[in-house]
Amino acid sequence: MATSKKPFQTNLIKAPNVVTRWTEQMVLELEQCKDPITGPAYFLANFFFIQHPTKGKIKYEAFQYQKELLDAYHNHRFSVNMLGRQLGKTTTAVGYLLWYAMFIDDSTILIAAHKYTGAKEIMQRLRYAYEVCPDHIRAGAKSYNKESIEFDNGSRIEAQTTTETTGRGMSLSLLYADEFAFVPPNIATEFWTSISPTLATGGKAIITSTPNSDEDQFAQIWNEANKRFDEFGNLTELGLNGFFPYMAKWDQHPDRDEIWANTERSRVGEERFRREHECVGANTLVTLKDIYGKIFEVTIAEFYNMC
């Protein structure tokens, strides 16, 4: 167990470069967290805690689609993820970002949220998860602020509102763009144009959102990521833009059924329900292959008319 004095007069934050008295179990747990393949899933399953609005501190327990989402985050350099509302995409991202910062040394992680309140909320969740993480697992903090954390392994996390210049000039290891479809279109386009070169040296990008419109920057990235057939008609893992697409809808949540869906449809209307919970819009593109092997694209509206 850690023996040195804590900084900031609190036990919530681990001091940098603390000397730890190790047990065999602690060493084993740390090594499992460090595993470059299985580490994220192990860390989230065992040491990632969240604040439930009514239950307080609870351990994160991933549903199947969240395990698949984590796999998309970790095993692909570029991933674009479209999920329905309240499916825990941001929570899963927070756990992964914390793991990445603590176990991938010298990482620079940028959280770009569509509003200041969003950036603040993500950092608040991340700070909470860090503060309740055991000392033998977590890295020490050299600086600890509302909008940034710098760890003693050389990694740092910053949260900012998405603007045309957010992240410009930074050498990013990992970009996380949250609710990207809700960034004003002109800002989203300028941001993506300016941020892309900062990832050229090998940085990762994770983009998540509930769909908003059919023509915003998120929709463009999503549509290009879903163009996944090569010249011979074979399905490829990545889209034309190098992104791996992942989608999860309301019915993949085990606590939601048709009774829930019908109630929600009555509350928000059919069109909004389809967009926010079924992740479809009238102009969303899907790629189809006919019985002769011909590949073509149609919109969701056209697809429904074909059925």
Where are these regions (language model features)?
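Phosphate/NTP-binding elements of NTP-utilizing enzymes
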Residues: 2-283, 289-307
